[in-house]
Amino acid sequence: MSAARQLTVTPLNDWGFFRLPPRPCVIAGPCSAESEEQVMTTAEGLKAFGINVFRAGIWKPRTHPGSFEGVGAPGLKWMQKVKKEYGMRICTEVAGEKHVFECLKYGVDMVWLGARTTANPFLVQEIAEALRDTDIPVLVKNPVNPDLDLWIGAFERLNREGITKIGAIHRGVSTTEKIKYRNAPEWDMAVELRARCPELPIFADPSHMAGKREYLQELSQRAMDLGLDGLMVESHCDPSCALSDAAQQLVPPDLQALLESLVVRDASSADEKFRDELSRLRAQIDVIDENLVFDLATRMKVSRKIGEVKKQHSVAIIQAGRWDEVLEKAVASARQYGLDEEFVKTVYNAIHEASVAEQNG
């Protein structure tokens, strides 16, 4: 784990949008603003159960040309109407300085950078400079690939331009593996971001992780279990007619039901008995962790010696048969102890990679 990074961040409660506790802070609205009627009807449905921050895509960076790419600036007038009639804060995605200037012109309260934009430092810098001397919050989605440093770099660029109302949106990452979700949740990325930037508010975007509405509840609950601050969820008055991402959008009443189903646990407890028990268990974990590191160090020493012996006898470092045997034994042990087999494989593959590096050294 890398060292914590020092960002200057205005606390979420000082943005004027949200109030913590309770969690989650919620941003909701359609994937895309499609018509005035659709925007207003959706906003009315969301406002009815207390949603105060309304999102809608105005410009849509689509994978294929010719797909619906958003209505553009005219949609900002509909957003403006939402703000005026329902008293909701409004936010949308920006991908360049032109978008920023249009948003400022129409009184948009908050903007976010999409995953593709975050992956391009030139665009991030352009947007940061366009937002200089403004006071609107900026949320940043993680890049499409699991690159935490690239994500943190976007916050640093915003900070350098004096922007301190910043927050993260974790939307999962692209994967070539066949999984049930649209994007791999990669929760470790959000956990590591919190460790390195503890002051940064983090929202989850279960809509883009899921790809299908049937998975939204489980992903939202997981975000709460991990202590994330909020959710950005796509909601449409009639998803069957949506021009983009129809399968992952909820009608407002279903979003209300989802939010009411979430179990949100406290970050700590004042109960002395609880604290004593937790301290005792954590002390056990500390000892186990120390032993783990000692055993890993010992294993690496043995790996180095094996490497030396192989070099002396001109034997190749990697011997697939031996590694298959080691992994098979580890998986069998995992099964015996009730451990997740994929987890054990991941750990052993990381150890194997480090061992090969030691032997090559």
Enumerate the predicted regions with their spans.
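Catalytic alpha/beta core domains of metabolic enzymes, predominantly
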Residues: 19, 123-257, 261, 266, ...
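Active-site mouth loops of central-metabolism enzymes
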Residues: 24-41, 65-69, 88-94, 114-115, ...
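Catalytic domains of carbohydrate-active enzymes, especially glycoside hydrolases
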Residues: 41-58, 106
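Glycine-rich, proline-tolerant flexible connector loops at the mouths of alpha/beta enzymes
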Residues: 55-74, 237-246, 306-315
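N-terminal active-site wall of soluble small-molecule enzyme domains
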Residues: 56, 61-111, 121-122
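Domain-level signature for soluble enzymes in the chorismate/prephenate branch of the shikimate pathway
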Residues: 267-361
